Amino acid sequence: MARNLRNRRGSDVEDASNAKVGYETQIKDENGIIHTTTRSLRKINYAEIEKVFDFLEDDQVMDKDETPVDVTSDEHHNNNQKGDDEDDDVDLVSPHENARTNEELTNERNLRKRKAHDPEEDDESFHEEDVDDDEEEEEADEFEDEYLDEDSKDNNRRRRAADRKFVVPDPDDDEEYDEDDEEGDRISHSASSKRLKRANSRRTRSSRHPETPPPVRRALRSRTRHSRTSNEENDDENDNSRNEALTLADEIRELQEDSPIREKRFLRERTKPVNYKLPPPLTASNAEEFIDKNNNALSFHNPSPARRGRGGWNASQNSGPTRRLFPTGGPFGGNDVTTIFGKNTNFYNQVPSAFSDNNNNKLILDSDSSDDEILPLGVTPKTKKENTQKKKKKKPEIADLDPLGVDMNVNFDDIGGLDNYIDQLKEMVALPLLYPELYQNFNITPPRGVLFHGPPGTGKTLMARALAASCSSDERKITFFMRKGADILSKWVGEAERQLRLLFEEAKKHQPSIIFFDEIDGLAPVRSSKQEQIHASIVSTLLALMDGMDNRGQVIVIGATNRPDAVDPALRRPGRFDREFYFPLPDVKARFKILQIQTRKWSSPLSTNFIDKLAFLTKGYGGADLRSLCTEAALISIQRSFPQIYRSNDKLLVDPSKIKVKVSDFMLALKKIVPSSARSTGSSPQPLPELIKPLLADQLNNLKNKLDYMLNIKDTTFQRNTSLLQNFIDYEEYSGEEEEHDKYGGNEDTSSFRSYEFFESMAESQICKPRLLINGPKGNGQQYVGAAILNYLEEFNVQNLDLASLVSESSRTIEAAVVQSFMEAKKRQPSVVFIPNLDIWINTIPENVILVLSGLFRSLQSNEKILLLCLAENLDISEVKNGILSDFAFDKNIFQLHKPSKENITRYFSNLIELLKTKPSDIPMKKRRVKPLPELQKVTSNAAPTNFDENGEPLSEKVVLRRKLKSFQHQDMRLKNVLKIKLSGLMDLFKNRYKRFRKPPIDDAFLVHLFEPETSNDPNWQPAYIKDENMILEVSTGRKFFNMDLDIVEERLWNGYYSEPKQFLKDIELIYRDANTIGDRERVIKASEMFANAQMGIEEISTPDFIQECKATRQRDLERQELFLEDEEKRAAMELEAKEQSQENILQEPDLKDNKANEFGVAAGNQLQAQLQTTINTASIVNNSEVPQPIDTNLYKKEIPAAIPSAVDKEKAVIPEDSGANEEYTTELIQATCTSEITTDDDERARKEPKENEDSLQTQVTEENFSKIDANTNNINHVKEIQSVNKPNSLHETVEKRERSPIPKEVVEPEQGKKSDKELILTPEQIKKVSACLIEHCQNFTVSQLEDVHSSVAKIIWKSKSAWDKTGTVDEIIKFLSE
């Protein structure tokens, strides 16, 4: 329509009659419809016309903004305003326009008629690619000649010629189009630019005359930048163009002239060269598409030029299955692509395709959510019920307001040695709940607070947990709140106090409840002027909450601390902390019970005697230390029984019932464990060592008797740490006080009080100022005696005042430390104030400190059980009686340590005489293993509890693998998405910067035959490109291409094909290698640049953790792919079998068996290959002509030496009878008999060994050669004779296991482990001589000097422990003593 609405010049009234005649003419089309004009037969592309209008409107807006105001145009507008008002439909025509002749118009119409509509080329009638370049130029020149003068015409021609010479087409602009499109663009370039020039000139005229817009001529949008640029440059030039107008007469004359009667017929003129290139053969899908395209040639649903020119014949594949050289499928799509190199595998489908009927839902991932379940037809999904109740507002006040879950597995039975405290806690918690009437009878309130204090690891926290668990039951629940200082403190002012209030309110709501403050010394320290105000406020709040105006109900507060002196004193009073439980280090009985508790659940529990001895050895161990000791002993027993599990990453099959803890395990654990009490400074309580007992045992017994007399320990009726309940259970109540109450002249109650007072005063009067000073020569074992006395007084509270304890804390003075220790001793009586090294102490400590301590002891009553125990060396007695120590009253309680007597020395050195008389064979020594450790079997994956089905039967390995892969599926999908996002930046950069690589080096149209096996197998077909392994071979040149492009890379990326960045980099490298193969310099440079950018970009996004996760995901993808291929093979086999069954009713059994035998899965490939190799190797060994002759067993008996040690098991080792042959002859004989696998290099190395190791070397050669003989002659019939005589199988198995064992091979030494009847060369006279020399030499020696002599003599004897002749040892001892 736009082409027909052309501007005509002038109008002739005479043509009206011709128009009338034209209207009366009737024309019939193909469908029989009558038309009166040819205009109705023309098909109009309204979409293109609308685009032209939009284009013109945009240009008009631009022209209005850019066109300057022209005075002449305004005058012309004013002059023509009158004519516009008279007739709006008639445009103004200049005289110059009227000068156009009818002959010119006729020629122009004839040129337009040559472009008549052709039904077969409907798609070409609306696009500028089919316009003849020469005719368009001629038409444009004639059109411009109508309005321009001669000078303007010449200028326009010169400018167009310069433009065509100057403008060079940009190759990058048309990279994405095919060659046909580029050719069409070049043809239509000049025509479209001319049309745009005419459109611009009309826009200029329309802007000058907005009242009468002329009819719009056809103006196509240019597809190149050059045409648009030319239009913009020529806007100013077209402003001076003449105005044109279309009158009604011109329109009527055009309708008359378009009549088919007057139209001349022109034959089709070919303007394009003939293309004799044969297209690729049509495939099945291409043929259907081609037929459909021809049938629908008259339709308007034609693709755009860019789409139509892309792909050529292969473009029709878009509606069918997509074809690619490389697989692009992933979990996000691309699995419907037919590939040549590789295969698309949708391995993210969890249900095997062989067992699934719905294969179209492969991309639907499995979900564990019930919302994703497929519902039956007609069933609506269940909607979540909204909670209509009013939701409770979550309390944001305290983060840890919820009570702590009580561990019901912990109870009082798990606590040993604290029976007294357990009974007292029960009467605080359980008894008020069970027997409230007992408390109401006396109108009392049970204690509501208790403070646990003592050394670390003594069971304070365990006691609180056991209390909550033991007192809770199904009928009554006790809520347990556990808080630490960090849970309460806050940086906001007043927040900590608010937290405490909320905690007590919550505990009161859930009463009965227990609040346990662990490490309460950090929450409520001692208030002082130097302390921060925040702690003082917290302490005040806690004091008010524990015992304020409000009754807190059945809320029990328990505090635990290691430093009771650091807790504020206001808390340590009845009403707040009613009771204070001191958790001391457990004594022997408590340790015995704790060890029983820790080992009672063992499969092989320890005996009572064993635990008793162990409890005696663990002095100073707390509850936590004893538990750690049992754990270490059990781990050491595991290491001793199964060391293989520490050298293997796989789970091995072990029998736990074979593991038993022995004495050696506990002894090793005792060396490893350091108890908590041993970490502190000063001497810790320890019993007298066994080695020192002969020297100090007698004097220590005398000290114990003296302490019993001083403190009256045995006559004490009740001790604080013992259970009062147990006392009432064991003893009856005293019944004589009712009968004797009249003797005291009062009633029953008064007499009872007087009776108790009398006997208590008599018992206390036996204690009077307990002081004890142990003095003796220097180095006479004072440290052993002091530790042994503290061990004997383990029920006493010990306060150590040694120098290290007093000066360790720089923040306090020595006087303060002394006063604090004394006050603690006074609170917890009976107690001991221990001062070691008193002689050094009085010379170091200032005199005022000694006076302060003496003043404190003076303030004590004489019957208080506070023992002052001091140790000294060579202290002057006069100084004790009359000097500065006289105030301590050591006059009568000074114990003098004497030097060991002759009898003590004789018993002390008796162990050395026993060591001297010990045979080397009786000395326990570490023996090297004779046999290697047995190889433990690996536990299969089915042993895990999750690898069993509902019936408890183990699942197969493949099912277990599928479950494992399914569990990682969501994680792998998430990682692929992360990888896509990280690589998307590089992908966008490559698409925009390197457009040349968006197409492969070889067009897909030339590779269509690769997808058709029938075509490729045709001998008459000679393709230009063929497949060569994983590359495309160009037959003419012999070059090979990978044919990778960026479109494939992008498709792979967004489909989730890549699991790790190196896959993406590998595809970019393929593009780079193809560029090198082509050899184009610019292409190689661009490809190298792209490859470098890819390398650096991937290196930036690659972190070690991310790469590790990507590798794991890649490995799982390979496993999924393997399972998928195996399922596909099974499915194909099932389909084939079903097809055969449909064709044949009865299958032959041999054929069926053969088919089943030939079906192998993917996972069975390695096993099948290994079996085939084994069969081939066996057959080659048997059929080989170089197999050695049968071996003479007698020859081995005579010639092979027997150098195997006696410790080797005779049943599993080969011990030849004769060992007289030399080593060289043996090696040569074995080499001649064995196969070629045994080389002579070992023999040459064996000859170079020293002669000292001939025996061991000969043994190793014999074992290795025997194992090789057996390994290489395993399939020979004559081997049975050798096995029957020499039994080489057992040796071969032993050596083979030794090589496979992770533990290195160890050979026993010949002299170790032998027990012989050989006697020592040691006479009784020599023993007596040594004993006499020792006693004579050590007369008047102190304990320290005796220890020195003992150590030196023990070294001499131990050095010659393996010698049977002790004469030299005796002489060396006597020589040492004489010196």
UniProtKB/Swiss-Prot annotation:
Impact when changing S304A: Severely decreases phosphorylation, causes a G2/M transition delay, and leads to sensitivity to 6-azauracil (impairs transcriptional elongation)
Q: Name one GO molecular function term.
A: ATP-dependent histone chaperone activity
- List all Basic residues biased stretches: 192-207, 218-228
Q: Enumerate the CDD domains for this protein.
A: Bromo_TBP7_like, RecA-like_Yta7-like
Question: Where found, per UniProt?
Answer: Chromosome, Centromere; Nucleus; Chromosome
Acidic residues bias located where? 119-152, 170-184
InterPro entries the record matches: AAA+_ATPase, AAA_lid_3, ATAD2-like, ATPase_AAA_core, ATPase_AAA_CS, Bromodomain, Bromodomain-like_sf, P-loop_NTPase
Q: Which residues bind ATP?
A: G454, P455, P456, G457, T458, G459, K460, T461
Q: Which residues carry this modification: N-acetylalanine?
A: A2
Annotated region AAA-ATPase: the residues are 450-578
Residue ranges, compositional bias (Polar residues): 1256-1274
Q: Which organism is it from?
A: Saccharomyces cerevisiae (strain ATCC 204508 / S288c) (Baker's yeast)
Phosphoserine sites (modified residues): S11, S17, S94, S241, S259, S285, S367, S369, S370, S735, S1142, S1256
Question: Modified after translation how?
Answer: Phosphorylated by CDK1 and casein kinase II during S-phase, which leads to its eviction from histone gene promoters and promotes histone gene transcription.
Which class of enzymes does this protein belong to?
hydrolase
Biological process per Gene Ontology, one example term: positive regulation of invasive growth in response to glucose limitation
Summarize the impact of T380A.
Severely decreases phosphorylation, causes a G2/M transition delay, and leads to sensitivity to 6-azauracil (impairs transcriptional elongation)
- Identification of the protein by name: ATPase histone chaperone YTA7
Function description: Functions as an ATP-dependent nucleosome disassembly factor that helps evict canonical histone H3 from the 5'-end of genes upon their induction. Also contributes to kinetochore assembly by cooperating with SCM3 to load the histone H3 variant CSE4/CENP-A at centromeres. Provides a chromatin boundary function at the 5'-end of genes that restricts access by RTT106 and thus prevents ectopic spreading of repressive chromatin into coding regions. Also prevents heterochromatin spreading downstream of the silent mating-type locus HMR, this function is independent of the tRNA boundary element.
